[in-house]
């Protein structure tokens, strides 16, 4: 069997990259390990175009946001599923945070994403009335789990997915192609998320994965339409249910949920609202993150038949569609963007093994 690409992994990165190849009429086979720990399985799908800690735009947001909206609307049409829900996010401000908010909106040119004036009119009887809020107009949510499940169904219909663990030792490299089992392709692209830390082809990459836990609560009296962001986010997902998250830890990177995370999330939620609730679910996942929190994309210089698309991290829902389109375009020779940073050999001691895409057009 001959295809253009082999894709390893069908989390968010693998799904978005496969969709771009599909859109560009390229053939591929996806190998997906159903037992792998994936952040996509528990991701809230929160879309946030700013970095609240510094009150700056998220990396590449001016290019990434319109591409994100286009891609998810296209996927909704292709899969016949509602996936993307744009909306507002209300950021809880500190007592003197209103002036800082207003100052940074102007200083960092955030008017396209945020309301300039702190919002003093947002009220919900179940949210503490001691808060003032900053309003993020361009926020929302992607149903990541529904997207991955529906796209997997499409791949199954097209006989383009194999739900099995990829064995690195069985990959055979030729000068201009790769072969795995009975599949030959021009390139193999690894979209493995946190599992990439065990990939022998990328052993010099500096991963810094983190574990995140989130809760699903049933809160009949809350009646909240907006996402609220404070010490935790509270995101409506329908039928009086809300996602509340998320924790960050850098040890015990597994799928086990913990009592400590549950307590942390509930304590922080109760700082926002005293409304009675019922815990419906608790999940844990591993965020695929690089040491510098930047997405890593590129081809091995010594073996350009091997590539990687990884490290989307907490901004993956926003940045993923943009990077997937640029990477697929680059591989297929029709990208209008250059990769600017130097590529280092897999055998070098360089901290950076691969390139990052730049937002500068050629």
Predicted regions and their residues:
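Dinucleotide-binding Rossmann-like beta1-alpha1 core, especially the glycine-rich loop
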Residues: 45-125
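Glycine-rich FAD pyrophosphate-binding loop
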Residues: 22-41
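C-terminal catalytic lobe of FAD-dependent flavoproteins
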Residues: 281-362
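Helical element adjacent to the flavin cofactor pocket in flavoenzyme catalytic cores
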Residues: 134-187, 191-195, 321
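Short beta-strand to alpha-helix junction loop
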Residues: 55-68, 134-150, 256-261, 318
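Beta1/beta-strand and adjacent pyrophosphate-binding region of the FAD-binding site
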Residues: 1-11
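Active-site substrate-recognition segment that forms the wall
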Residues: 13-24, 46, 51, 80-84, ...
């Amino acid at each position: 069997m001959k295809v253009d690409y082999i894709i390893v992994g069908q989390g968010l990165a693998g799904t978005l990259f496969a969709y771009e190849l599909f859109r560009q009429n390229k053939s591929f086979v996806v190998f997906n390990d159903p037992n792998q720990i994936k952040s996509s399985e528990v991701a809230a799908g929160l879309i946030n175009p700013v970095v609240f800690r510094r009150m700056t735009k998220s990396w590449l947001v001016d290019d990434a946001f319109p591409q994100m909206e286009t891609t998810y609307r296209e996927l909704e049409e292709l899969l016949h599923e509602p996936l993307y829900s744009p909306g507002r996010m209300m950021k809880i401000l500190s007592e003197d945070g209103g002036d800082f908010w207003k100052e940074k909106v102007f200083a960092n040119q955030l008017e396209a994403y945020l309301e300039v004036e702190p919002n003093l009119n947002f009220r919900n009887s179940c949210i503490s009335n001691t808060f003032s809020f900053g309003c993020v107009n361009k926020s929302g949510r992607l149903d990541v789990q529904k997207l991955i499940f529906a796209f997997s169904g499409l791949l199954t219909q097209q006989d383009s997915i194999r739900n099995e663990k990829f064995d690195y030792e069985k990959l055979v490299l030729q000068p201009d192609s790769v072969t795995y089992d009975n599949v030959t392709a021009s390139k193999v692209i690894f979209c493995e998320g946190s599992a990439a830390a065990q990939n022998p082809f990328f052993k010099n990459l500096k991963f810094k994965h983190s574990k995140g836990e989130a809760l699903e609560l049933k809160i009949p009296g809350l009646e909240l339409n907006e996402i609220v962001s404070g010490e935790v986010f509270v995101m409506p997902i329908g039928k009086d249910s809300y996602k509340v998250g998320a924790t960050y830890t850098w040890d015990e990177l597994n799928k086990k949920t913990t009592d400590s995370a549950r307590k942390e999330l509930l304590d922080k939620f109760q700082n926002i609202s005293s409304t009675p609730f019922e815990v419906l679910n608790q999940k844990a996942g591993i965020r695929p993150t690089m040491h510098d929190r930047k997405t890593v994309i590129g081809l091995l210089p010594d073996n350009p038949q091997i590539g990687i698309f990884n490290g989307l991290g907490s901004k993956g829902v926003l940045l993923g569609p943009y990077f997937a389109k640029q990477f697929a375009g680059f591989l297929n020779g029709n990208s209008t963007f250059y990769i600017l940073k130097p590529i280092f050999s897999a055998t070098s001691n360089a901290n950076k093994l691969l390139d990052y895409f730049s937002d500068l057009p050629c």
